[in-house]
Amino acid sequence: MGRAVGIDLGTTNSCIATLEGGEPTVIVNAEGARTTPSVVAFSKSGEILVGEVAKRQAVTNVDRTISSVKRHMGTDWTVDIDGKEWTPQEISAQILMKLKRDAEAYLGEPVTDAVITCPAYFNDAQRQATKDAGTIAGLNVLRIINEPTAAALAYGLEKSKEDERILVFDLGGGTFDVSLLEIGKDDDGFSTIQVQATSGDNHLGGDDWDQRIIDWLVGEVKNKYGVDLSKDKIALQRLKEAAEQAKKELSSSMSTTINMQYLAMTPDGTPVHLDETLTRAHFEEMTKDLLDRCRTPFNNVLADAGISVSQIDHVILVGGSTRMPAVKELVKELDGGKEANQSVNPDEVVAIGAAVQSGVIKGDRKDVLLIDVTPLSLGIETKGGIMTKLIERNTAIPAKRSEIFSTAEDNQPSVLIQVYQGEREFARDNKPLGTFELTGIAPAPRGVPQIEVTFDIDANGIVHVSAKDKGTGKEQSMTITGGSALPKEEIDQMIKDAEAHEADDKKRKEDAETRNNAENFAYQTEKLVNDNKDKLSDDVAKSVTDAINELKDALKGDDIEKIKAAQEKLMTEAQKIGQALYAQQGAEGAAGAADSGSANNGGDDDVVDAEVVDDDDKDNK
């Protein structure tokens, strides 16, 4: 019988742990380290390298080295290596296989079962991809559990206090999660850990802080040498490694020096050297907006749980990125001035918690009960494009819910079940998970057939859906498999703030009309200037053109008020065109004035109203 392990499959680093005598132990890898870089490389000879050895050769093998693949999980992203398309699941499986091999060498016995962690805010496709990676690696995946939950599990085992409410602030290399949990322990030492709420951002992590340093260094080189390194893959890889190191050094020092020789060559053959000093203050200034993105999930969790900051006993920091001083200060600010609890190792605590859960599932530990939640609501599209939710977010899992629906037309022979995940009121604004059809419905007037739709979320957070015609007994079901069905750009987090989204929905039509009107006005005014260049003075043409360009620049952004202001300015400037044309034509006499009136009427024809889409049409789209 093989051993069970817990694996933290991270964006930047991964970690594996197991139970020894009922207690969790981190397993060191073949290189003697307790964490393994989540990097996979393919050597020119075809050998697959994983971990530190892959990371070390990245500069000389840029195109065949893959890092941060976790950010692509659940998408259709692939990388071509020697004619083979590698999916994120397959790349991740190579990391898991390395961890599995090292664990087997350490333990001296086969490793067969694993609990693998994923961000709490991973959607169904991303969770399924994580499970698939484990299967490809030859592991029996006992469970997919959320990283903050695993961290709380590890933390809770050491606590003697009977009841504690903790908030896990998990900022890793590529993802960010916040989870609120209650930990209780009875007189017999039995621990109950229950998740109350969770929120996050699947595209926020230490990689983004690194990228800001890289962008700054690229800009410095361009300013000094006139060389653009943004297309130089080898130079970028060197900058990436230097940026990561600089970020780490700034966690303990107020400044750091980045010194790199022979980064590139100028067109005249001069070597490009880099010698820059980056202060912590400058680093924090250039990443302030990233830090601010951590606020909303924190506040959302408190709102969803219906508690105040004062009701949190401890905030636990998880993930290597929480070592940054600015992050610690933010947590202190959000937590009402209290210092965060730093009693756990942020790099290892998730794997330790996963190992404990593997022991619970295998029966090696019987003193823990873990109750997790689904981070996003699940539902189907009903008439009018409405998202009808069957399972609300933050529902404890496993969970099963059923609801009766009917047909929308007389004698309707089938119904299309379209499954979505998210918090928006309209299905089109949420993430599609899958579609299936229930056929063979007996002829009947609309509203008479009874179609029972059932959602079942297993302990992994993976969704199973079924539909049954209660009249005929016919049934159709599906397991959401995710993966390549979801485009990359649609893996962004699915919920920010439900109230904010409602406000966005109400403003959407107004904002769209404002933008359309502004675009049309800019186009028509520019056309009028071009058609009458010989009749306008240079000053008038320039002032109007400048206003047109200002409006165009505003239209590139999302600030509606800025667009309105720019349009009003252009309307004022555009009046000068009419004044100039009237003045010129007035000088030509009465006939000219008549022509001017005709031209003015023609000018009205140039104004194009924005298209108005009928509400019924919108619902049918």
From Swiss-Prot:
Region entry Disordered, spans: 499-520, 583-621
Record field: compositional bias (Basic and acidic residues): 499-516
Keyword Phosphoprotein: yes
One Pfam family in the UniProt entry: HSP70
InterPro entries according to UniProt: ATPase_NBD, Chaperone_DnaK, Heat_shock_70_CS, HSP70_C_sf, HSP70_peptide-bd_sf, Hsp_70_fam
Keyword field: ATP-binding, Chaperone, Nucleotide-binding, Phosphoprotein, Stress response
Function: Acts as a chaperone.
NCBIfam families on file: PRK00290.1 (NF001413), prok_dnaK (TIGR02350)
Protein name: Chaperone protein DnaK
Organism: Bifidobacterium animalis subsp. lactis (strain AD011)
